[in-house]
Amino acid sequence: MDHKPLLQERPPAYNLEAGQGDYACGPHGYGAIPTAPPPPPYPYLVTGIPTSHPRVYNIHSRTVTRYPANSIVVVGGCPVCRVGVLEYCFTCLGIFLAIVLFPFGFLCCFALRKRRCPNCGAVFT
């Protein structure tokens, strides 16, 4: 393999004048971005004696009613310690009736359950 430099000639200069090089614009600006037309003149108001009365603004004050902050109520929260969440537990009588009266005993079992707080141990019927 030959180790020859890839470019034999020097690259073109960056400061090209009009009419030189492949990418330069022609003498008439062919390919150049046209300039935008100037914006229309701003309509100025004629100063003089005002023909209408000055505006009057009425400022009305409103009364602001402040409500107390809402308290967060946890559904199923313990009313005694306010930390634990109440869990359902079945009573011994409910479990006994569920076994003895098999198909209909489940109704008795669910009717005889209690709510218990695992944090403070309070029991609610």
UniProtKB/Swiss-Prot annotation:
- Keywords, ordered alphabetically: Cytoplasm, Lysosome, Membrane, Transmembrane, Transmembrane helix
Where found, per UniProt?
Lysosome membrane; Cytoplasm, Perinuclear region
Q: Which InterPro entries match?
A: BRI3 (IPR019317)
User: What Pfam family does this protein match (any one)?
Assistant: BRI3
- Gene Ontology CC: lysosomal membrane; perinuclear region of cytoplasm
Q: Tell me the subunit arrangement.
A: Interacts with BRI3BP. Interacts with MGAT1 and IFITM3.
Protein name per Swiss-Prot or TrEMBL: Membrane protein BRI3
- Organism (species): Mus musculus (Mouse)
